[in-house]
A protein has these predicted regions:
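Short histidine-centered beta-strand/loop micro-motifs
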Residues: 45-46, 56-60, 77-78, 96-97, ...
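The feature marks the first
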Residues: 28-32, 36-74
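Histidine-centered metal-chelating micro-motifs
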Residues: 53-56, 74, 86-95, 188, ...
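Catalytic core of non-heme Fe(II) oxygenases with the double-stranded beta-helix
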Residues: 53, 57, 131-162, 166-168
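Glycine- and acidic-residue-biased ligand/ion/polar-headgroup-sensing regions
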Residues: 50-51, 60-75, 156-158, 162-178, ...
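A short, N-terminal "cap"/entry segment at the start of jelly-roll beta-barrel domains
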Residues: 1-39, 101, 105-150
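Ligand-binding loop in jelly-roll beta-barrel domains
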Residues: 28, 79, 90-115, 181, ...
Length: 210
């Protein structure tokens, strides 16, 4: 399977309006945003676990990162409530599930081979950054050699340079970018060199950005 795999093209997916697609694990469904491959794939998805559902133990050769959007995600290493951000390096494994149900935003197979640091940022964790025009809050969750991950709250129009490529997920609120209204769980990817111009609504927006 190849889905939204042209990294040179601007891509928008309104994931909040998509249907859920069953996964091989009973009670686990997903909304696919980007994918190259079948079950062992390089992928970006929103995944929903029904109460009591889980995957069998497996490894992620290319690493895994996820943000808990709703509920509490669980594996052998602990419980991860809403707002937790986790990076599991290449070749780490687990048996993920949720006793009470949860929804996560997850990226698979997109680590560099040298990225071997496991991170588990709690809700509201990370490093607070200085405020910028239009940005009322900015927290860096990860800052590595090739990428930086932040959560920001926007209260007015935003302009961001984008020399290296950018993707974001709207966590709350809304804004208009490139003529598209991006609302909760909308996903945007911009190629390197294409700046972001966001017209932010009166309620503001909270976004996850890489």
């Amino acid at each position: 399977m190849r889905l939204n795999d042209d990294l040179s093209a601007r891509t928008v997916v309104h994931a909040g309006a998509m249907s859920w697609v069953p996964s091989p694990a009973k009670g686990v469904e997903r909304r696919m945003l980007f994918r190259i491959g079948e079950e062992k794939a390089r992928a970006t998805s929103i995944v929903r676990y029904a109460p009591g559902s889980r995957f069998a133990r497996h490894e992620h050769p290319g690493g895994e990162e996820f943000l808990v959007l709703e509920g509490t995600f669980q594996d052998e290493t602990g419980d991860f409530p809403t707002g937790t951000y986790v990076r599991n390096p290449p070749w780490t494994g687990h048996a993920p599930g949720s006793a009470s149900g949860c929804t996560i935003f997850v990226k698979l197979g997109q680590f560099g081979e040298a990225d071997r640091t496991r991170i588990a940022q709690p809700p509201e964790g990370g490093t607070a950054m200085p405020r910028q025009p239009g940005v009322t809050s900015s927290r860096t969750l990860f800052d590595g050699a090739n990428e930086r991950v932040v959560i920001e709250e926007w209260r007015s129009d935003i302009e961001l340079d984008n020399p290296d490529g950018l993707e974001l997920l709207v966590l709350d609120g809304c804004f208009v970018e490139g003529g598209d209204m991006l609302e909760r769980w909308s996903w945007l990817r911009l190629p390197a060199g294409e700046p972001l111009y966001a017209q932010v609504g009166s309620k503001g927006a909270r976004v996850w950005i890489k």
